[in-house]
Curated annotation (Swiss-Prot):
Entry protein name: Maturase K
Listed GO biological process terms: mRNA processing; RNA splicing; tRNA processing
GO cellular component: chloroplast
Entry GO MF terms: RNA binding
Naturally occurring in which organism (per UniProt): Ceratonia siliqua (Carob)
Function summary: Usually encoded in the trnK tRNA gene intron. Probably assists in splicing its own and other chloroplast group II introns.
Location relative to the cell: Plastid, Chloroplast
């Protein structure tokens, strides 16, 4: 963020607040290159080290300075369009660099809004595990939950019109429009799956920018109406500056609701509604009745249809009772479990029996999908029986053990928040035995002979539980650590979850 701010201030002083000239700056492509090496959140890395270099960028900038070269590359020997979809290296590099330049003002706006609201930066809050303590604190007191998948894609023209309110530089806006419409036909949606998949892989940063912008626009209106319209003049709604036709959109939504419901905004004022999202999936939970949740359901459908012209099937948004149904979010099945208890109270000669029900959030590891994932990458078969990993048999013993250890520790690190650790122990057992079988295969031996020769203590020490390691470091507190470790542990250093 600080690098972005320095670069943007430099460009502003020289280019009068225009973003378009930034695509002629070499450091923009350096930032895109660095992002490509370090990011693998939604899309796989495409080998940026093979596709980007300072020489290629210099050559690209020189060609962009040529007149009319940004429209059609007439000098290309293969006669391909300069912006041809996934056919030209230059178009991909420009799209990545342009995505960086467009992200800069949004990053600065976010920083300024946080400073105005006096929100302290906390890297712990960036961890996706920080969501689960929130679940533990709030969800036992709620009754209903709804799984909502944000519909995507949005029509191109709607996306362009939304972006027009934010991108004030006309040249940048026209270049952005050129990118979008050259990648897709005018009358197509952004959604044939083969197109969206190819586009997300060939231009990951540009794709993420468009998707995140759409989600941000949807959530800004959703949360604004959730907090009722009187909040518009407060500091918390600073993200709505310079919005054109925003009031008109709200009036249109109000008219839609006025036709369907007697009261328009009263159901936005419920203090017990909670909204959580990660990537394209969100959770909506409330303490109110199913009738209230059903209103929210159709409110979201109207919002998508009226404001973004995206169709969402009402039957795909399910409203379930938390005590009877589990919802899947961030790799866990979660539900609210009822723990009934009976307390006998004695007062003088009279005794009373008091029945009490405690609610507790359960987080369960999805063992069957995890075993399927392990079977897909050849750690076990479809039934969960460990098998060797032949692809790794050519590596050294140290590399083989290190790979298995990293996978085992990462899974243990992520799923230590489970209420029931039995499933986690099963996954560890599969990885441990698969490691032994891979080593035995490499040395052309059986598992029994290999362990007898090497000694089973070695792998036992390598796969030692974190609980045992802590007890060795703090022997006096071993009993306390044992009770703590058997409970749920949420780590605040996990920043993304790769599906």
């Amino acid at each position: 963020m600080e690098e972005f701010q320095v670069y943007l201030e430099l460009a502003r002083s020289r280019q009068h607040d225009f973003l378009y000239p930034l695509i002629f700056r070499e450091y923009i492509y350096a930032l895109a290159y660095d992002h490509g090496l370090n990011s693998s959140i939604l899309v796989e890395n495409l080998g940026y080290d093979n596709k980007s270099s300072l020489l290629i960028v210099k050559r690209l900038i020189t060609r962009m300075y040529q007149q009319n070269h940004l429209i059609i590359s007439a000098n290309d020997s293969n006669k391909k369009r300069f912006w041809g979809y996934n056919k030209n290296l230059y178009s991909q590099i420009i799209s990545e660099g342009f995505a960086v330049s467009v992200e800069i003002p949004f990053s600065l706006q976010l920083i300024s809004s946080l400073e105005e609201a006096k929100i302290i930066k906390s890297y712990n809050l960036r961890s996706i595990h920080s969501i689960f303590p929130f679940f533990e604190d709030k969800f036992p007191y709620l009754n209903y939950v709804s799984d909502v998948r944000i519909p995507y894609p949005i029509h191109l023209e709607i996306l362009v019109q939304i972006l027009r309110y934010w991108v004030k530089d006309a040249s940048s806006f026209h270049l952005l429009r050129l990118f979008i419409y050259e990648y897709y036909n005018w009358n197509s949606l952004i959604t044939p799956k083969k197109w969206i998949s190819t586009f997300s892989k060939s231009n990951p940063r540009f794709f993420l920018f468009l998707y995140n912008f759409y989600v941000c626009e949807y959530e800004s209106i959703f949360l604004f109406l959730r907090n009722k319209s009187s909040y518009l003049r407060l500091t918390s709604s600073g993200v709505f500056f310079e919005r054109i036709y925003f009031y008109a959109k709200i009036e249109h939504l109000v008219e839609v609701f006025d036709k369907d419901f007697p009261s328009t905004l009263w159901f936005f004022k419920d203090p017990f509604i909670h909204y959580v999202r990660y990537q394209g999936k969100s959770i909506l939970a409330s303490k109110n009745t199913p009738f209230f949740m059903n209103k929210w359901k159709y409110y979201l459908i109207h919002l998508w249809q009226c404001n973004f012209y995206v169709w969402s099937q009402p039957g795909k948004i399910h409203i379930n009772q938390l005590s009877e149904h589990s919802f899947y979010f961030l790799g866990y099945f979660s539900n609210v479990r009822l723990n009934p208890s009976v307390v006998r109270s004695q007062m003088l000669e009279n005794s009373f029996i008091i029945e009490n029900v405690m609610k507790k959030l359960d987080t369960i590891i999805p063992i069957i999908p995890l075993i399927r994932s392990l079977a897909k990458v050849k750690f076990c078969n479809g039934l969960g029986h460990p098998i060797s990993k032949p692809v790794w048999a050519d590596s050294s013993d140290f590399d083989i053990i290190d790979r298995f250890l990293r996978i085992c520790r990462n899974l243990s690190h992520y799923y230590n928040g489970s209420s029931k650790k039995k499933s986690l122990y099963r996954i560890k057992y599969i990885l441990r035995l698969s490691c032994i079988k891979t080593l035995a295969r490499k040395h052309k031996s059986t598992v029994r002979v290999f362990l007898k020769r090497l000694g089973s203590e070695l792998l036992e020490e390598l796969f030692t539980e974190e609980e045992e390691i802590l007890s060795l470091i703090f022997p006096r507190a071993s009993s306390t650590l044992h009770r703590l470790y058997r409970g749920r542990i949420w780590y605040l250093d996990i920043f993304y979850f790769h599906q």
